[in-house]
UniProtKB/Swiss-Prot annotation:
The keyword Nucleus does not apply. GO terms for cellular component: extracellular region. This is Short cationic peptide-6d. It is found in: Secreted. It comes from the Eukaryota. Keywords: Secreted, Toxin. The keyword Signal does not apply.
Length: 12
């Protein structure tokens, strides 16, 4: 899962 990783980075 890296879509969540990208989203988490954008969310932060």
């Amino acid at each position: 899962i890296n879509k969540y990783r990208e989203w988490k980075n954008k969310k932060n």
